[in-house]
């Protein structure tokens, strides 16, 4: 193997190992993974956003869980619901990126992977309850706001929909 080709292969392997996404059912998550998920969600939703509301809502067992790791550190997460579980439509939510890992595109990766996962399962349309300040972010992925803004845990939210063919 040529030295240049070998170097390119090594760089590709390092890049591939750096970020990893995994989707698991609730029952397939280890205790350590569940602890890391709840810790990340609490860190952002309760502490950072100063939202003193219960994060654990009894819906995690109904969801599939998308975990994004960088160098074996859980740095981003979302949970994905098939239709007729959280909403009539398929959905994903509790989308979170660790503060120290923002600006790397991980939020976009979570949304793209969630859409891809639901699309592969023929789940259409997708409805999300987006924090209103993130409307442009979700619109960049094709989501369209519908209805009036509402409060969820005292934070302004907007229902947004994505339909694909």
Question: Model-derived features: where do they sit?
Answer:
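N-terminal amphipathic/basic-hydrophobic helices that include classical n-h-c signal peptides
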Residues: 1-17
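Short amphipathic alpha-helix that is part of the acyltransferase structural core
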Residues: 12-65, 69-74
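Conserved beta-strand in the GNAT
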Residues: 67, 73-82, 89-96
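A conserved beta-turn-beta hairpin within the catalytic core of GNAT-like acetyltransferases
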Residues: 82-92, 102, 124, 152-157
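Conserved acetyl-CoA-binding loop-helix of GNAT-fold acetyltransferases
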Residues: 97, 103-116
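Residue-level recognition of the GNAT/N-acetyltransferase active site
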Residues: 98, 131
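Conserved GNAT acetyl-CoA-binding A-motif
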Residues: 118-130
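Conserved catalytic-core motifs of GNAT/GCN5-like acyltransferases
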Residues: 127-129, 139, 144-159
């Amino acid at each position: 193997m040529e030295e240049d080709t070998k170097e390119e292969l090594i760089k590709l392997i390092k890049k591939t190992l750096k970020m990893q996404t995994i989707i698991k059912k609730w029952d397939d998550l280890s205790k350590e993974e569940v602890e890391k998920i709840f810790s990340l969600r609490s860190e952002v939703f309760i502490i950072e956003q100063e939202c003193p509301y219960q994060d654990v809502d009894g819906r995690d067992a109904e969801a599939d869980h998308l975990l994004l790791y960088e160098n074996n550190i859980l740095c981003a997460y979302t949970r994905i619901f098939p239709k007729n579980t959280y909403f009539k439509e398929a959905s994903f939510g509790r989308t979170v990126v660790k503060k120290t890992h923002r600006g790397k595109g991980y939020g976009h990766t979570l949304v793209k992977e969630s859409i891809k996962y639901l699309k592969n399962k023929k789940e259409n349309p997708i409805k999300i309850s987006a924090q209103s300040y993130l409307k442009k972010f979700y619109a960049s992925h094709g989501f369209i706001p519908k209805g009036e803004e509402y409060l969820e845990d005292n934070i302004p939210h907007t229902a947004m929909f994505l339909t694909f063919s």
